[in-house]
């Protein structure tokens, strides 16, 4: 650090005399270049994550875990602005910067405007034109048997989980920094089967295939793409059945090697780890975070 300030002092004029035939402006330009390099060394560029559905449940946990690892966060919400603003306050109390933006991932026509909002937010809050991490987390759950699932329910799940992830990522990709990371949320239900989740699991299976294709095609930009597949988690997802129904909770725990149902922090911590500097060589993978359910 002393080197940085020593070099900066010479720019202020103490040692800025030019040799015969040399330009003082040229000397200052060279010195400024050195200082910029030192500044980048001591103060690396802050990394920014966008987390869809970050106002509650798993997305909230991801936001807080990433902030705990020194990341800044842009989180999205659909209708729960109060909850989203509360997460922003929590992150700011941790010494990090956060912004909440409204986004309906089922409304694909809104993605262009959302992309512009992200661009303006990056410029106004971070003086940047790109971000580092995208976590496609937003989603809903619909419990219905194969025979009872309606076309409307099927389309709703597809528009949010599969089509939304596909086209939102496509729209935001020009803003993702080269060497960045993308995490798509899948589900343990894409591996094991439980009655009532045929349509939901089909979308998550699609996410896992999409993840591999994205990893292949975005490799030229050194962008890694992975899928995180949670098991059953105690949240308000799907009406909070796993959290609030003791019979369901006990059954899932009995089918899990570690003997309990998952918690939001189990997933938030896993996603934060996948976005850490130590995980840059993981690419195109499905990472199940379920405590070993249905082994």
Please annotate each region the language model reported.
Residues 55-56:
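Conserved glycine-rich cofactor-binding loop
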Residues 131, 145-146, 150-158, 252:
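Substrate-binding pocket helix/loop in short-chain dehydrogenase/reductase
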Residues 169, 203, 211:
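Active-site helix of classical SDR
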Residues 192, 272, 283-295:
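Short C-terminal tail/terminal secondary-structure segment
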């Amino acid at each position: 650090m002393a080197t940085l300030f020593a070099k900066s002092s010479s720019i202020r004029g103490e040692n800025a005399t030019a040799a015969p035939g040399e330009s003082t402006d040229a000397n200052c330009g060279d010195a400024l270049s050195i200082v910029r390099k030192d500044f980048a060394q001591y103060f690396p560029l802050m990394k920014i994550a966008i987390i869809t559905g970050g106002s509650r449940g798993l997305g909230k946990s991801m936001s807080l875990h990433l902030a705990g690892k020194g990341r800044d966060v842009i989180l999205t919400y659909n209708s729960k602005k109060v909850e989203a603003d509360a997460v922003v306050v929590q992150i700011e109390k941790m010494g990090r910067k956060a912004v909440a933006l409204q986004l309906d991932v089922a409304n694909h026509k809104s993605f262009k405007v959302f992309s512009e909002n992200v661009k303006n937010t990056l410029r106004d809050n971070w003086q940047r034109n790109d971000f580092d991490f995208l976590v496609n987390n937003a989603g809903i759950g619909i419990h219905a048997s194969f025979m009872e699932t309606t076309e409307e329910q099927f389309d709703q799940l597809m528009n949010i989980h599969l089509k939304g992830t596909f086209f939102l990522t496509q729209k935001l990709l020009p803003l993702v920094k080269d060497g960045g990371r993308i995490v798509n949320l899948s589900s343990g239900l894409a591996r094991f089967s439980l009655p009532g989740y045929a349509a939901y699991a089909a979308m998550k299976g699609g996410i896992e295939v999409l993840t591999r294709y994205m990893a292949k095609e975005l490799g030229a930009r050194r962008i890694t793409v992975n899928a995180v597949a949670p098991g059953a988690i105690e949240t308000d997802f799907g009406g909070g059945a796993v959290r609030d129904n003791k019979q369901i909770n006990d059954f899932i725990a009995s089918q899990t090697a570690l003997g309990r149902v998952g918690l939001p922090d189990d997933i938030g911590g896993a996603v934060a780890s996948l976005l850490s500097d130590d995980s840059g060589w993981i690419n195109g993978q499905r990472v199940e975070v379920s405590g070993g359910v249905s082994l």
